[in-house]
């Protein structure tokens, strides 16, 4: 029953995207479309800025995910494999940052962006999404590295590898599930984020991302529900496809990352 309740809005979105406008506005809602149409998808694809905003979202999302993986991998390795003063305090700050409601920082972030002339710029969104996803990525990768026996890297060092070389040649292949799990989390977080994108992109409307673009189907004359649902369906496809492709790795990655996280 819980699954049905959770999935019904998704089903309703997809089914509405294929219904003719007269059926959408009917006083007698239909659970299953009796007549199928692709008109709403055509209208969504033909909307102003469709390709441009897809490009913006892809650039911002991939940039944030790759940057978070790079920084988090170094931080997780340092915490899991090295002993240094302040290590526990560092992880405490990471946990606090992970639990922090990032929406509460939107005003300070806006002021900083305004004063540094970073408003209306895609790199600003990339950095913000990077900071939002970084704590979680560090926690999961740290737990995952902790499950890899250090003896494997030590054996590689005995064979002539440097410490860094041993990590890249031995540990990195074993980290694949953890990297995929955190990548998926970062992708979904950055791909779906609306508040910062809507608040920080003010004048340069060509720098908007897809979540903000979806609101363009609402105007003073009402909402084009067919096109909105079609655009929302297209918007949800990348995250859904990536999740289905990586589902097995994601499950094992989160499970392993939670062991010593």
Question: What do the predicted segments below correspond to?
Answer:
Residues 1-261:
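A structural signal for multi-pass alpha-helical bundles of membrane permease subunits
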């Amino acid at each position: 029953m819980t699954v049905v309740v959770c999935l019904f809005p998704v089903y309703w979105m997809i089914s509405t995207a294929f219904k003719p406008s007269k059926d959408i506005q009917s006083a007698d809602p239909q659970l299953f479309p009796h007549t199928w149409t692709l008109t709403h998808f055509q209208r969504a694809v033909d909307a102003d800025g469709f390709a441009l905003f897809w490009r913006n979202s892809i650039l911002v999302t991939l940039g944030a995910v790759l940057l978070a993986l790079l920084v988090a991998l170094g931080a997780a390795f340092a915490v899991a494999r090295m002993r240094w003063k302040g290590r526990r305090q560092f992880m405490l700050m990471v946990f606090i940052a992970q639990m922090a409601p990032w929406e509460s920082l939107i005003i300070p972030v806006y002021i900083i962006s305004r004063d540094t002339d970073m408003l209306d710029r895609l790199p600003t969104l990339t950095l913000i999404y990077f900071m939002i996803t970084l704590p979680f990525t560090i926690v999961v990768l740290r737990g995952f590295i902790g499950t890899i026996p250090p003896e494997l890297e030590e054996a590689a060092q005995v064979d002539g590898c440097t410490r860094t070389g041993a990590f890249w040649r031995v540990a990195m292949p074993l980290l694949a599930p953890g990297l995929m799990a955190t990548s998926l989390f970062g992708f979904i977080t950055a791909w779906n984020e609306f508040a910062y994108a809507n608040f920080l992109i003010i004048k340069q409307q060509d720098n908007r991302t897809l979540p903000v673009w979806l609101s363009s189907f609402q105007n003073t004359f009402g909402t084009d529900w067919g096109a909105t649902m079609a655009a929302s369906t297209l918007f949800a496809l990348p995250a859904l496809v990536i999740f289905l492709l990586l589902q097995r790795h994601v499950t094992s990655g989160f499970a392993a990352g939670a062991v010593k996280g």
